[in-house]
């Protein structure tokens, strides 16, 4: 069943004669608080004049919770989040004056709340929260009956008080709202530039670091920039900064390893270019390190140039004082004129025998 706004029963607004005015108004100095019958009635005009003369009290300032479309001529159209001042109240209706527009008229009392309250703050920030405070459907502002039939409804309510109580309870039901909590929940980096389009959106630039304060809406996050400004940005436009740092560290480690390998290969190539094309003398070979002899055959397991393939009995040369990899020797094989790694246990200095 659609939720319909309460219908305020108006009395007939006939022009009051001087006699009726004198009859309705009390003696001078004691102004009565009679029932309001419309924005153009004598009582209404007198009450408005008194309120304006004495000034609007701070307690009269209210915030509109829902959009309201007038059904009759003495009602006022208001929008959610608009500020108004209440001049007086009649049952479920209040006569208000807009702070900006200065227009006056009736709105339902349940459609407004005092300033600096939870409901008022949610109404001012139209997006807070997006899912938990859905806007009222348009059908709620459609009048139940025409103006001519309102008197008949009033008579029916007098005969059936139980029905009136149930309707009143239904009209007082307000949507449930939870507090909009803002707590730091991690730093993020902006992946794409976003330009604010709504009053609660926040413009951010690509590469900027922000702090996430609320993630209740899966599509929009409430964030804070480094300058303290807060607002909504699309959730898909930001990414956790911690994950980015981990990726950057991994990439830096890989780049460092690639650099070391490239330097090793360049050093190997430069040494090979400096070697003579023919065989080297014994004195020249000793510049490559200690003379060793292979005890076993070894075949390189990787297709790159970091390992040597040698056979048992081959002579190799290695600088035993400058080895960085445990269990391996960086050696030079004169037979193949190449540098590479061989297992340390596969070679040893040749045995010297006395004659």
Swiss-Prot record:
GO cellular component, as recorded: apical cortex; apicolateral plasma membrane; cilium; cytoplasm; subapical part of cell
Mutant lacking the gene: phenotype: RNAi-mediated knockdown results in reduced spacing between the anterior and posterior crossveins of the wing, reduced levels of subapical cortical dachs, increased levels of dachs throughout the cytoplasm, increased total cellular levels of dachs and suppression of the overgrowth and dachs up-regulation seen in ft mutants.
Pfam families assigned: SH3_2 (PF07653), SH3_9 (PF14604)
Residue ranges occupied by any SH3 domain in the UniProt entry: 57-117, 183-243, 287-352
GO molecular function annotations of the record: cadherin binding
GO biological process, any: protein localization involved in establishment of planar polarity
Posttranslational mods: Palmitoylated by app.
Primary location class: cytoplasm
Alphabetical list of SMART domains matching this protein: SH3 (SM00326)
Cystine connections: none
InterPro entries: NADPH_Oxidase/PX-Domain, SH3-like_dom_sf, SH3_domain
Subcellular location field: Cytoplasm; Cytoplasm, Cell cortex
Gene3D superfamilies: SH3 Domains
Keywords noted in UniProt: Cytoplasm, Lipoprotein, Palmitate, Repeat, SH3 domain
UniProt xrefs under PANTHER family: SH3 AND PX DOMAIN-CONTAINING PROTEIN 2A, SH3 MULTIPLE DOMAIN
Main function: Required for the apical cell cortex localization, total cellular level and full activity of dachs.
Record's subunit section: Interacts with dachs (via C-terminus); the interaction is direct. Interacts (via N-terminus including SH3 domain 1) with palmitoyltransferase app; this leads to palmitoylation of Dlish by app. Also interacts with dco, ft, ft-regulated E3 ubiquitin ligase Fbxl7, F-box protein slmb and SCF E3 ubiquitin-protein ligase complex component Cul1.
Name of the protein this chain belongs to: SH3 domain-containing protein Dlish
């Amino acid at each position: 069943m659609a939720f319909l706004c309460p219908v305020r029963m108006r009395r007939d607004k006939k022009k009051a004669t001087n006699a009726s005015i004198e009859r309705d108004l009390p003696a001078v100095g004691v102004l009565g608080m009679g029932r309001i019958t419309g924005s153009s009635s004598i009582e209404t005009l007198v009450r408005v004049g008194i309120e304006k003369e004495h000034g609007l009290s701070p307690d009269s300032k209210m915030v509109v919770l829902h959009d309201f479309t007038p059904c009759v001529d003495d009602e006022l159209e208001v929008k959610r989040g608009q500020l108004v001042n209440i001049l007086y109240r009649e049952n479920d209706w209040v006569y208000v004056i807009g702070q900006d527009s200065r227009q006056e008229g009736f709105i339902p009392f349940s459609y407004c709340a005092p300033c600096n309250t939870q409901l008022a703050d949610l109404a001012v920030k139209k997006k807070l929260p997006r899912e938990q405070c859905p806007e009222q459907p348009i059908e709620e502002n459609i009048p139940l009956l025409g103006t001519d039939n309102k008197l008949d409804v009033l008579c029916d309510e007098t005969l059936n008080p139980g029905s009136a109580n149930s309707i009143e309870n239904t009209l007082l039901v307000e949507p449930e709202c939870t507090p909009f909590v803002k707590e730091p929940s991690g730093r993020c980096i902006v992946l794409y530039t976003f330009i604010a389009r709504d009053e609660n959106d926040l413009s951010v630039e690509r590469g900027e670091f922000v702090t996430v304060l609320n993630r209740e809406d899966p599509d929009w996050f409430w964030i804070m920039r480094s300058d303290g400004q807060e607002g909504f940005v699309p959730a898909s436009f930001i990414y956790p900064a911690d994950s980015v740092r981990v990726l950057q560290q991994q990439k830096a480690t890989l780049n460092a390893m690639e650099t070391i390998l490239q330097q090793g290969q360049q050093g190997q190539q430069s040494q090979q270019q400096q070697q003579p094309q023919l065989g080297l003398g014994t004195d020249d070979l000793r510049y490559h390190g200690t003379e060793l002899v292979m005890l076993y055959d070894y075949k390189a397991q990787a297709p790159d140039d970091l390992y040597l393939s040698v056979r048992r009995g081959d002579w190799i040369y290695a600088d035993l004082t400058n080895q960085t990899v445990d269990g391996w020797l960086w050696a030079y094989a004169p037979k193949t004129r190449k540098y590479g790694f061989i297992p340390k246990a596969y070679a040893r200095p040749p045995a010297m025998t006395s004659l």
